[in-house]
């Protein structure tokens, strides 16, 4: 699908790569690379680091206009469509609206990275409005996500989608290691994973006490961040109040059809995109004895979502460059990716497997991590699926 003809650097049929139950995937290099972050930055054209408020905001306006167009069509024309065509119409609306709102979510994510404009205050205002409208506590997630970028690939300090060792996985996991179990696990993860992460830190790094993105005094945040966590909570309260008023005026069924189901699709895409960016049989994780920031930042995979690459503002197919240079705006990210690929060589990871096939494969093969038996270092961990 899509991908502009890019070749995958991870797929191979070389039988010498039979490790960890992934004979069809070539492992990424895990030793220190022969290049530096400075080498990569010098390869990127300087204009790729320029952030234009006008250009960035044009994408916000475009997404909002499309979202309003879909809303107008649904509310003005769908009541006159008889069943069963009305069911088809609503399914199309939910899918289209969910995809557009996912793209809008991505722009809010860029605001949190200061990749929207040269003005931090403008970035935070736009990000707060956009993410609050999608029931995301903007500042709370901005700070936890920043720590994810600072510690990516570390088994001890990464913030989210931290794989467990075989000895620490849940006792019931092996009973879900079958097709029905994987369907159940994927459904629960896609539908509930994002709100459970925000509210209960599910799939997040362990803390010594209860961690929650809505708690200004929780262990995720520092004292200087608390005021902004309150502001993020106020944003969620404001959106919840608007939804309450809409429910009183139009009914819960109307709110769910117009807003609730598209938001659920946003949450599903968000979990799937994030999961596939950081989960792959061919990429390592590092213990404290091996981890360093540059190698950790390369523990990510660019994926192909076809036409949705543009709808999602290239968040999925330029994610390697994003973890190396998070302030590059999305409209320069593809150019930056093309610039660093020749230098990175096999350290750059791209997998063109259709995302629905990749999701099933990763759910099957990436269950826990362990170091290779007899390896010279025990600080490099690889995904396994054999209990």
Swiss-Prot record:
- Give UniProt keywords alphabetically: Endoplasmic reticulum, Fatty acid biosynthesis, Fatty acid metabolism, Lipid biosynthesis, Lipid metabolism, Membrane, Microsome, Monooxygenase, Oxidoreductase, Transmembrane, Transmembrane helix
Oxidoreductase: present as a keyword of the record?
yes
Record-linked InterPro entries: FA_desaturase_dom, FAS_N, Fatty_acid_desaturase
Q: How is its activity regulated?
A: Inhibited by oleoyloxyethyl phosphocholine.
From the UniProt record, give the pathway where this protein acts. Answer: Lipid metabolism; monounsaturated fatty acid biosynthesis
This entry carries the following GO cellular component terms, namely: endoplasmic reticulum membrane
Any GO molecular function: oxidoreductase activity
Q: Where is this motif: Histidine box-2?
A: 145-149
Q: Where is this motif: Histidine box-3?
A: 319-323
Membrane topology type, per the record? Multi-pass membrane protein
Gene Ontology biological process terms from the UniProt entry: fatty acid biosynthetic process
How activity varies with temperature is described as: Optimum temperature is 22.5 degrees Celsius.
Region: Disordered, residue numbers:
1-34
**Disulphide bridges:** none
Biotech relevance, as the record puts it, is:
Promotes the accumulation of hydroxy fatty acids when expressed in A.thaliana.
Transmembrane segments in this chain: where? Answer: 61-81, 88-108, 121-141, 183-203, 229-249, 253-273
Q: Indicate the family of this protein.
A: Belongs to the fatty acid desaturase type 1 family.
Q: Please state what the annotation says regarding this protein's domains.
A: The histidine box domains may contain the active site and/or be involved in metal ion binding.
Q: What does this protein do?
A: Oleoyl-12-hydroxylase involved in the biosynthesis of ricinoleate (12-hydroxy-cis-9-octadecenoate), the major fatty acid constituent of the oil seeds from castor bean plants. Catalyzes the hydroxylation at the 12-position of 1-acyl-2-oleoyl-sn-glycero-3-phosphocholine (2-oleoyl-PC), which seems to be the actual physiological subtrate. It uses cytochrome b5 as an electron donor. May also be involved in the production of lesquerolic acid (14-hydroxyeicos-cis-ll-enoic acid) in vitro.
Q: Would you tell me the protein name for this molecule?
A: Oleoyl-12-hydroxylase FAH12
């Amino acid at each position: 699908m899509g991908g502009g003809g890019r070749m995958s650097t991870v797929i191979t049929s070389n039988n010498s790569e039979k490790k960890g139950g992934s004979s069809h995937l070539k492992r990424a290099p895990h030793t220190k690379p022969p290049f530096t972050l400075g080498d990569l930055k010098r390869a990127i054209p300087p204009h790729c680091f320029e952030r234009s408020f006008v250009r960035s905001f044009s994408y916000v306006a475009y997404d909002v206009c499309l979202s309003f167009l879909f809303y107008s069509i649904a509310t003005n024309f769908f009541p006159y469509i008889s069943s069963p065509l009305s069911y088809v119409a609503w399914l199309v609306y939910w899918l289209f609206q969910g995809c557009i709102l996912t793209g809008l979510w991505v722009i809010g994510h860029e605001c949190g990275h200061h990749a929207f404009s040269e003005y931090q205050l403008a970035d935070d205002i736009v990000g707060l409005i956009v993410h609050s409208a999608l029931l995301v506590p903007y500042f709370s997630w901005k700070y936890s996500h920043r720590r994810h970028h600072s510690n990516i690939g570390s088994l001890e300090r990464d913030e989210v989608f931290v794989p467990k060792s075989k000895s620490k996985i849940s006792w019931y996991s092996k009973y879900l290691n079958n097709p029905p179990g994987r369907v159940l696990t994927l459904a629960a993860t896609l539908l509930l994973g994002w709100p459970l992460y925000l509210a209960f830190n599910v799939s997040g790094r362990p803390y010594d006490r209860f961690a929650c993105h809505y708690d200004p005094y929780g262990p995720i945040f520092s004292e200087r961040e608390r005021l902004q966590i309150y502001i993020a909570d106020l944003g969620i309260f404001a959106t919840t109040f608007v939804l309450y008023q809409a429910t009183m005026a139009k009914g819960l069924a109307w709110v769910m059809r117009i807003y609730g189901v598209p938001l659920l699709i946003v949450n599903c895409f968000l979990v799937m995109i994030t999961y596939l960016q950081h989960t792959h049989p061919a990429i390592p994780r590092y213990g404290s004895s091996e981890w360093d920031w540059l190698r950790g930042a390369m523990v990510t995979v660019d994926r192909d979502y076809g036409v949705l690459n543009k709808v999602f503002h290239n968040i999925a197919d330029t994610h390697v460059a994003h973890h190396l240079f998070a302030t590059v705006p999305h409209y320069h990210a593809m150019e930056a990716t093309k610039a660093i690929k020749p230098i990175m060589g096999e350290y750059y990871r791209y997998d063109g497997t259709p995302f629905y096939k990749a999701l099933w494969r990763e759910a099957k093969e990436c269950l826990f991590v362990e170091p290779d038996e007899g390896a010279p270092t025990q600080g490099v961990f690889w995904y396994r699926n054999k209990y």
